[in-house]
Amino acid sequence: MDADAWNQRYDTAELVWTGEPNRFLPPEVAGLDPGSALDLACGEGRNAVWLATQGWNVTGVDFSATGVAKAERLATDKGVSGIWITADATDWVAPAGGYDLVIIFYLQLPAVERCAAVRTAMSALAVDGTFLLVAHDLLNLSEGFGGPQDAAVLTTVEDILDDVTSAELDLGLELVTEKAGRVDRVVSTPEGERTAIDTLVRVHRVS
């Protein structure tokens, strides 16, 4: 989906997604001291806004102007603020080393564009910073519930680690993978609980 399609999807009074953070975000950042955080492909802002409520100085970037506007409204409703930018995560020029935490949640792109987005994230990551990515895993297509039904935009752990390594070499960084694996996510439906399968990768920048 392009920016126009997402603008149409987000053009509702209500949030398309819940206003609460993704279930994996709070536990994965629980041990970090709040600093500056970047949410690439922030959508309606639920993760960025939650980080702001926890004391982070947040910047949210998304190519949907409608999504960005809703993120700003959600922040206002929650009594927090942030910097909200309409831009494409694959080619946005981020402040080099400007963020202590960079997150990408469910940015489902073909391989070349996904690799570019991960490079953007790594270029923005400060020394001693943390990168966290969660995405719909390829295995979800055959064994999980929901998510895109196009294998070309689904991920594997190996895909993301390859993207990270590519960015590490290209940018001359030293990165350490702290966590990389598939994780299950329970989804409530009218028919009962179902299980979605996600990719989760967390990386620390050493230098």
Region annotations inferred by a language model:
Residues 64-66:
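Conserved SAM/SAH-binding beta-strand->alpha-helix loop
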